[in-house]
Amino acid sequence: MSEEIILEARDIWHSYEENDRFSLQGLDLKVKKGSKVAFMGANGSGKSTLMNRLIGQKIAITSNKPQTTRNRIQTVLTTEEGQIVFVDTPGIHKAKNKLGEYMVNIAERSLNEVDVVLWLVEPSTFIGAGEKHIIEQLKKVKTPVILVINKVDMVKKEEVLTFIDAYRKECDFAEIVPVSARRGDNTDELVNVIMKYLPYGPQFYDEDTITDQPERQIVAEIIREKALHSLNEEIPHGIAVAIDQMKMNHKVCHIDATIICERDSHKGIIIGKQGSMLKKIGSTARFEIERLLDCKVNLKLWVKVQKNWRDSDYMMKNFGYREDEM
């Protein structure tokens, strides 16, 4: 079902009087609560970890490296009450190249295309320039903004309360919800709070759908995640992963992928002594891809230099960073 048809059906739904809506809910029209919810958060705040926790499966990659999330990733949680489409956006930051501009544009556009915004922060009373910049952006948003305090299992309760007071003075949040994405503490309550603010309307996806990402893209992101975990600080910003081939043969998925970097010196580091680093990235990625696809995987990796690819619209589109597909 196209998004235009869904939005038209939602308009028809809202045209009914409240009593008529109540009567219609008894019919199998899939008219429950449901809409899109944007995830925002600084590097290392745990956005992807929380989103994976909420849907019960790993879709978004996790790393403490800056700007890990590059595309707008949508995951779907369907309950008896309705459907939440979580939109994991790249963080808002000062762009240094076209890739950075692409990421910031996606993040800012997403804020105007959802019914609820979740802003994920770590428990600290220090509100710096970066946080204040995001707060100013959120004040322009017409939809409810829920402040989610992650990693509360790492601090004392009194510190969390002090932190809540500090942020309340900065912005009028619709709700403030403390959670631990790592342990799953209070995440069910977060879902209940989100549902309070969602409109009634048809669901965007079938009940068994958990993401809009194609398998090839998820596989590419898994490989990139393992590279992020293994490589030095200066390299991850300049790498991308292209899936050259992915096919099933005799119950084994054969995948050929290329890790793209920007410098010849980086290529040597990614390969490692006698191929040791590339083997490490490949083995850890293969294990997780097998869990995702539920089959044996034969993964072959290559490394290729594409200088300044982050400033090339053509190469960015080749590597899956396309605004026209948003």
Regions of interest found by a model, annotated:
Residues 9:
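Conserved catalytic Walker-motif region of ABC-type ATPase nucleotide-binding domains
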Residues 40-42, 63:
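The feature captures the beta-strand-to-loop junction immediately N-terminal to the Walker
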Residues 18, 32-33:
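Residue at the conserved pre-P-loop
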Residues 48-96:
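Conserved G1/Walker A P-loop phosphate-binding module
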Residues 2-6, 15-26:
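A short, flexible loop at the N-terminus of ABC-type nucleotide-binding domains that lies
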Residues 105-174:
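Conserved C-terminal guanine-recognition region of P-loop GTPase G domains, centered on the G4
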Residues 153-210:
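Canonical P-loop GTPase G-domain recognition
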